[in-house]
């Protein structure tokens, strides 16, 4: 037989004489043991059966076997029933010796050659060239039923059936398993012949190196199986109703079924249910082995009695064998698939059902770590995900951003790398609310800057004005950008005042000075210009005293590690306004000590200061009114902030209204108010170059008296103070929010320019000389949004 797989496993492929002899023995066993005479069938089914049983040579020592078998091969002349002649034409009409030049199928050509030789032995040699067209197998051949030519479209048919019954039988099988000529069903049949009926289970010559004792055991084993278990199914029409043994479904009379005489005459199966009980494949050519009432193919029946070697596919007859992974091997065959080193008692790795030693497995199949690039050995732990591999260590299997270990915890694969959280996958530090994040990472540059500002030591010449001042300071959250802004504005103020000693030895030591400080983070809904000014008790004072008070303010901001927090988080961490009021009052007390000509201002605002100046300097009221007309108007300017967007609005100067607004805004964040108040104090102190009451009054006026909206040129008035409206509850829409804060540098430049322009212009009309400036009385409130 020209089977490449069989030639690789067996030194001598089965010959045509082997198939013929096997068929004869099988027929004799069934005829003599059960009374069934299959020798009466036509030569066509007989030759097909010789193809089936070719790989299952069953040695049955019987003298009657040869005679009966020879009679069967010769054409079934002995004991043949007359029913065979009704549907099978004479053999000389159906088969003849094939010509030497005819190309036969590479898989089944030896089988057909054997059948032609058998037919030629009976029919003679007179029709060698007269029926060449019959040898060209056609799937849809057309002929009458008496000729039997319709059976030639199959490579095998069940014995004892008419052509219409053959078609009825094959209609019960899947199309891909019907053995049409040159079809997938034919290839399936040949494959199952080799698999279900391995020749090495019956013939010594198909085995490799067997000892004399093992050869003897093989012959005894094969003969016993044939005698006790071998059989072939018979296909007939059912005469009565009975259930199918395979699927338990009822069968009715007239159905075509399969009988197995060794299991009992009352048991029958659908043609598609006649399968092996182990592999569930159709029993090829209806050849079966039975044991304990179950059907088996030849391979699995042999394995129920003897183990089979997984390497050579032969039955193990020796007393010793190796068992591994639920399978068995000969002792010498359990070796590495690559280097053939025997693995008995040694460590090995199974891959695709084949054993490998550790060295060969590492060489052929080891993976490389995606982090360190080293080989992951078989003795090392390995983590794998979506085609990627890592060492199972804290260093290799870790977050790509923060390098925290991911062993035993969920991870986030993204773009070929793994992360511990979504924040790390974006290159950001994890937020406190991120429960999936690992250990806290290193603080950002902004947080480091804030921490450095908060921990800076005080200057050497600082004097403690109030011993209990530290106890009144809270710990509001602040940002590093606010500290940078305060330090820069302090330097500008000191340069404007001409205090050189403070510039050389003062300030805040070690404070970084970025070229472009980040913007102040304002996260409140609305920022009132009046609220910014309302917290100041005094804008007068020595520059040194103001500098000395700054470290206390900066020290209260040391706890912040994340600059940009959500609005809700900032509000939760904000202290009450009482703490802010105490801090502002202490700053005013310090400033008052160095400014004795000016009395302490009340907490509520600047109104009493205006009244006192009117009483003391009434003769100069007109002059002050003229100065008021020449003063620049305070404007609202836009300050872009990336994270938030606030709204700003102007209020009136009435102190009672400011008290009400202060109580109404208890929940506002004190951090942003303290930042804005500090900016305003620094701006007012920076713009003051003299200490005369008139200059101080002008600076005070610039802060709050004439707050003119730059958009609609309207101002707030105390007349409409009782009608101040309240903003609705803020809804967070996301995105970028715009905040409005006074820009000190621009305000200072504009004020100087407007002062110069007004000095060149002719004097304004009705202006008082020594009194306080008059307050404008418009009745409009402006909201910039």
Curated annotation (Swiss-Prot):
Task: Classify the source by domain of life.
Answer: Eukaryota
Chain intervals with Basic and acidic residues compositional bias: 459-469
Q: GO molecular function, one example? A: zinc ion binding
Biased composition, class Polar residues, residue ranges: 15-25, 641-653
Question: Compositionally biased, Basic residues: which spans?
Answer: 657-666
Q: Where is the composition biased (Gly residues)?
A: 67-79
Alphabetically list the UniProt keywords. Answer: LIM domain, Metal-binding, Repeat, Zinc
- Comp. bias intervals (Low complexity): 1-10
Looking at the record, the residues that make up the PET domain are: 135-243
Q: Where is the signal peptide?
A: none
Q: One Pfam match, by short name?
A: PET
What is this protein's record name? Protein espinas
Provide the species name. Answer: Drosophila melanogaster (Fruit fly)
Its taxonomic path starts at: Eukaryota, Metazoa, Ecdysozoa, Arthropoda, Hexapoda
